[in-house]
C-alpha cells in the first residue's frame, strides 16, 4: 500500500538531485481549493515537495505555467478519490474475478444453474492454470496471428555482428506476438506457462514478482520467454500493466512526480519505484539504485546490490537477459508491455543506456508498447532517440483512438511530460497513422468530450456486430460489451482495453517498418 512518510525525503547522506513529489494526502480539500483558486503558497507547499535548495523557478518554465495549476489540482483530486476507493476497488476486483471464473468454469450462467441443481459446481481456484484475470475475461484470445510463421522470419537472420541486416520485424506478425505477450502478462504464472509452452510452442524462462519499496509489496510482474529452448533467435520481455481494480496502479498513472537524472532528464518517479529503483520517502535511494557503485568506499554495498537483484524488476530482468544473451549467441531481444507495463518496457532500455550496457543494447531488436503513459520530459526523449531510433526506428508506441492512458500525465508547462518514438495511431476503424504524437495529446475541452461520446456509441455498435463482420475470433462477449457501455460515461476508458489493441494489430494494414540489428 502507498504510504506517505511525513519525514519527507529522508536525511541519508548522498547525491542530492532535482525532483518534484506530488503528495495528494498531506493537505485537505480546503487546501486544494485554496491552491486551485487562489494559488495559496502555503497550501501549495503541502502538496508539492522539492529539494530544500531548489526554488520554484527551477521547476516551472515561466509565469504562464502557473495558469496550468488546475492540471495539478485535478491530478491530486483524482488520486485522493482513488485512494478513498482503494478498498472497495480491491473487494470489487476480488468478487468480479471470482464470479467471472465461476461462470466460465461451469459453462456460463445457465450452465452454472444446471450444475447447482446437479450439485456439481466447479469452484475456481486462484493461481491455477484455469483461473483467468479480468483482462483475460474481456478478451479470451490466446492464439497468435495464424498467418505468420514466426521461426521462418527469424532463422534467416545472421549474427548480430553481421552489419545492418534489415528485416521486416515491424510487420503484423511480431506486433501480434508483442501485443499478445502484453495481454498475457496480466495472468498468473501457471496460465503464462501454459500459454507460452503449450499453445505458442515456445519456452518460458522466468515469471517474476518484483519488489516496489514505496508500496512495500511485490507489485511489479514481468515474464521472459524465448522462441525455443536451444539456439534461440528471439528473447521477449513482457511487463504487466495497470490492473483494472488496482488503485495503486491507477494512482501511479495519474502521478506527476519526477526525479531528474543528470544528462538524461526528468523520469517519472512512480515508474522508477515500480522498477524497484527507489522510494520517494528517501529520494537518495534513487541515485544509489540507478548507479551501481564501484568505488572502494562502497564495497560494503555489494550485499545490498545482490539483494536488489533478487527484488528489483530492473536488476532481476537484466541478470536474466545477460545470461540468455550469453547462452544464445544469435538471439536478440524485444521488450513490450501495455499501459503501466508499456512505461516499464521503454524505461528498461533507458536504464540500460544510463548504466552504459552497450553490449546489451546492441542486441536490442525493438520495443513495442501499447497504451503507454508518458515516462519523462523532452530531454529524456532526445537522450533516447539517439540510442533507439538511429539509423532506424526500434521503438514503436501503439495508441488506439481515445485511450486516455497514453495522454497521461498531461503534457503541460509545469511538468513537461513528453512522448518520444514513432507513434502508430489507430482510429475507431482500425486505420493506421504514423506520427510523432497521437491526436489530442491533452484531452480536454468540449470538442474532445462530444467527439469522445460519439465514438463510444460507434464502438458499442461495432462491438455488437464484429462477430458477424469479421468472424468468430472478433466476437465480443457480454462482459466486453458491458465495459463498452462504461465508455459512454467515461470516453477513453473502454479504449484502453486490450481488445482494441489486438484488433488494431490484426485488422490494421501490414506494416512495412524496418528494424536493423545495428
Swiss-Prot record:
> Is Transmembrane given among the entry's keywords?
yes
Its record classes its membrane topology as: Single-pass membrane protein
Please give an example of a GO cellular component term from this record. Answer: membrane
Q: Where in the cell is it found?
A: Lipid droplet; Membrane
- The broad enzyme category this protein falls into is hydrolase
Q: Which Pfam families match?
A: Lipase_3
Which tissues does the record link to its expression? Expressed in pollen grains, pollen tubes, developing embryos, developing seeds and germinating seeds.
What are the recorded GO MF terms, alphabetically? monoacylglycerol lipase activity; triacylglycerol lipase activity
The superkingdom listed in its UniProt entry is Eukaryota
Q: Which Gene3D superfamilies match?
A: alpha/beta hydrolase (3.40.50.1820)
What does it catalyze?
A: 1,2-di-(9Z-octadecenoyl)-glycerol + (9Z)-octadecenoate + H(+) = 1,2,3-tri-(9Z-octadecenoyl)-glycerol + H2O; 1-(9Z-octadecenoyl)-glycerol + H2O = glycerol + (9Z)-octadecenoate + H(+)
Q: How does activity depend on pH?
A: Optimum pH is 5.5.
Q: Name one GO biological process term.
A: lipid catabolic process
For this UniProt record, the keywords arranged alphabetically read as follows: Hydrolase, Lipid degradation, Lipid droplet, Lipid metabolism, Membrane, Transmembrane, Transmembrane helix
TM region(s), chain numbering:
93-113
Statement: the UniProt record of this protein carries the keyword Disulfide bond: no
What are the positions of the active site?
Answer: 339 (nucleophile), 403 (charge relay system), 496 (charge relay system)
Motif GXSXG: where? 337-341
Q: What is its EC number?
A: 3.1.1.-
| InterPro entries xrefs | AB_hydrolase_fold, Fungal_lipase-type, OBL-like
Q: What happens when the gene is disrupted?
A: Reduced pollen tube growth.
What family name appears in the similarity comment? Belongs to the AB hydrolase superfamily. Lipase family.
Q: What does this protein do?
A: Acid lipase that can hydrolyze a range of triacylglycerols without a clear preference for acyl-chains. Can also cleave 1,2-diacylglycerol, 1,3-diacylglycerol and 1-monoacylglycerol, but not phosphatidylcholine, phosphatidylethanolamine, or sterol esters. Required for pollen tube growth. Triacylglycerol hydrolysis by OBL1 may provide acyl groups for the synthesis of membrane lipids in growing pollen tubes.
Name of the protein in question:
Triacylglycerol lipase OBL1
Q: What is the lineage of its organism?
A: Eukaryota, Viridiplantae, Streptophyta, Embryophyta, Tracheophyta
Amino acid at each position: 500500500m502507498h504510504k506517505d512518510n511525513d519525514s519527507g525525503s529522508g536525511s541519508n547522506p548522498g547525491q542530492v538531485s532535482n525532483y518534484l513529489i506530488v503528495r495528494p494526502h498531506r493537505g485537505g480539500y480546503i487546501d486544494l481549493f485554496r491552491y486551485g483558486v487562489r494559488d495559496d503558497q502555503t497550501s501549495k507547499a503541502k502538496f508539492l515537495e522539492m529539494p530544500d535548495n531548489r526554488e520554484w523557478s527551477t521547476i516551472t518554465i515561466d509565469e504562464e505555467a502557473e495558469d496550468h495549476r488546475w492540471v495539478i489540482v485535478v491530478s491530486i483530486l483524482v488520486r485522493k478519490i482513488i485512494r478513498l476507493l482503494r478498498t472497495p476497488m480491491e473487494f470489487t476486483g476480488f468478487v468480479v474475478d471470482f464470479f467471472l471464473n465461476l461462470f466460465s468454469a461451469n459453462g456460463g450462467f445457465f450452465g452454472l444453474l444446471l450444475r447447482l441443481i446437479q450439485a456439481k459446481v466447479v469452484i475456481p481456484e486462484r493461481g491455477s492454470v484455469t483461473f483467468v484475470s479480468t483482462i483475460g475475461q474481456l478478451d479470451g484470445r490466446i492464439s497468435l496471428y495464424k498467418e505468420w510463421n514466426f521461426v521462418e522470419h527469424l532463422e534467416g537472420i545472421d549474427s548480430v555482428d553481421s552489419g545492418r541486416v534489415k528485416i521486416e520485424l515491424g510487420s503484423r506478425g511480431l506486433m501480434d506476438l508483442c501485443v499478445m505477450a502484453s495481454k498475457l502478462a496480466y495472468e498468473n504464472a501457471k496460465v503464462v506457462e501454459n500459454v507460452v509452452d503449450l499453445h505458442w510452442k515456445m519456452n518460458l524462462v522466468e515469471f517474476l514478482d518484483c519488489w516496489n519499496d514505496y508500496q512495500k509489496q511485490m507489485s511489479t510482474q514481468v515474464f521472459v520467454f524465448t522462441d525455443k529452448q536451444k539456439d534461440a533467435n528471439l528473447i521477449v520481455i513482457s511487463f504487466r500493466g495497470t490492473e483494472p481494480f488496482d488503485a495503486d496502479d491507477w494512482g501511479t498513472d495519474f502521478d506527476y512526480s519526477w526525479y531528474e537524472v543528470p544528462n538524461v532528464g526528468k523520469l517519472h518517479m512512480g515508474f522508477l519505484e515500480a522498477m524497484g529503483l527507489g522510494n520517494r520517502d528517501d529520494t537518495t535511494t534513487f541515485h544509489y539504485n540507478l548507479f551501481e557503485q564501484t568505488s572502494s568506499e562502497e564495497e560494503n554495498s555489494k550485499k545490498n546490490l545482490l539483494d536488489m537483484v533478487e527484488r528489483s524488476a530492473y536488476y532481476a530482468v537484466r541478470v536474466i537477459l545477460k545470461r540468455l544473451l550469453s547462452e544464445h549467441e544469435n538471439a536478440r531481444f524485444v521488450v513490450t508491455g501495455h499501459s503501466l507495463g508499456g512505461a516499464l518496457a521503454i524505461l528498461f532500455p533507458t536504464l540500460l543506456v544510463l548504466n552504459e550496457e552497450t553490449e546489451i543494447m546492441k542486441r536490442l531488436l525493438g520495443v513495442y508498447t501499447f497504451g503507454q503513459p508518458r515516462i519523462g520530459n523532452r530531454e529524456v526523449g532526445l537522450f533516447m532517440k539517439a540510442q533507439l531510433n538511429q539509423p532506424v526506428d526500434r521503438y514503436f508506441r501503439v495508441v488506439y483512438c481515445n485511450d486516455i492512458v497514453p495522454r497521461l500525465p498531461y503534457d503541460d508547462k509545469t511538468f513537461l511530460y513528453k512522448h518520444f518514438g514513432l507513434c502508430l495511431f489507430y482510429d475507431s476503424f482500425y486505420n493506421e497513422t504514423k506520427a510523432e504524437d497521437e491526436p489530442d495529446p491533452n484531452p480536454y475541452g468540449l470538442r474532445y468530450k462530444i467527439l469522445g461520446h460519439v465514438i463510444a456509441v460507434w464502438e458499442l455498435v461495432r462491438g455488437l456486430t464484429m462477430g458477424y463482420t469479421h468472424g468468430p475470433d472478433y466476437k465480443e462477449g457480454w462482459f466486453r460489451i458491458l465495459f463498452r457501455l462504461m465508455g459512454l460515461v467515461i470516453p477513453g476508458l473502454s479504449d484502453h482495453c486490450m481488445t482494441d489493441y489486438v484488433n488494431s494489430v490484426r485488422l490494421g494494414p501490414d506494416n512495412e517498418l524496418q528494424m536493423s540489428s545495428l
